[in-house]
């Protein structure tokens, strides 16, 4: 289905130490220092089922460190062929995750050995699994009004700049971008508006922005700033993750632009 030119809400399931959590992204470097907004008492399958029941396509499951694989598989098995998986993905395990039921795999740090972007790695994994099954996560940090890819739990800033030329290059080998603004991720203090504007100008494939989203107004803002070309993930602000924004409201937002599928 062709992407409608409206920003949609894109859900997430973030897994840390085997549990569904919402964390402050910039604090992920050391487990002892991780700032946690929310730890769910519910299994990953609860969220996968919730997204399935509400026809929320394109959710991403992110494994934040070790001991997350079983919880990730549980989510994928709950809604096979519908959830994307990221966190530690490389050319050796990507096919396995697709076989476990992921719709697409999300690759990040593996593309940056020694913090240097490796185009040959991108070409290789794209060739192996197909660009239609590959999402590139170019999560970033801001420096002097420019944005650079950040890897290894967003702690290492690379020299790979987010700009139209580089995103055009990446888009030859993948079908989608996921972009976490690591400086504002999990803070619920608003989005990086400048980055969203730039992404709206640069991207030519489906793109999801995550970082700082906290309200329905932010969905409307991203829609306007990106001219509907960038979707928005909201995590910590949602009531299903201990926040105040009602999940039913983001579902209703999507229904305005994506009618429910016909029932059999």
Swiss-Prot record:
Primary localization class, coarse: cytoplasm
Superkingdom to which the source organism belongs: Eukaryota
Keyword list, A-Z: Amino-acid biosynthesis, Cytoplasm, Histidine biosynthesis, Isomerase
CDD domains cross-referenced by the UniProt entry: HisA_HisF
One matching Pfam family: His_biosynth
InterPro entries associated with the record: Aldolase_TIM, His6-like_euk, His_biosynth, Isoase_HisA-like, RibuloseP-bd_barrel
EC assignment: 5.3.1.16
Subcellular location(s) of the protein: Cytoplasm
CC annotations in GO: cytoplasm; cytosol; nucleus
GO molecular function, one term: 1-(5-phosphoribosyl)-5-[(5-phosphoribosylamino)methylideneamino]imidazole-4-carboxamide isomerase activity
Known catalytic reactions: 1-(5-phospho-beta-D-ribosyl)-5-[(5-phospho-beta-D-ribosylamino)methylideneamino]imidazole-4-carboxamide = 5-[(5-phospho-1-deoxy-D-ribulos-1-ylimino)methylamino]-1-(5-phospho-beta-D-ribosyl)imidazole-4-carboxamide
GO BP: any one term: L-histidine biosynthetic process
Pathway: Amino-acid biosynthesis; L-histidine biosynthesis; L-histidine from 5-phospho-alpha-D-ribose 1-diphosphate: step 4/9
Family label: Belongs to the HisA/HisF family.
Protein name from the UniProt record: 1-(5-phosphoribosyl)-5-[(5-phosphoribosylamino)methylideneamino] imidazole-4-carboxamide isomerase
Source organism: Schizosaccharomyces pombe (strain 972 / ATCC 24843)
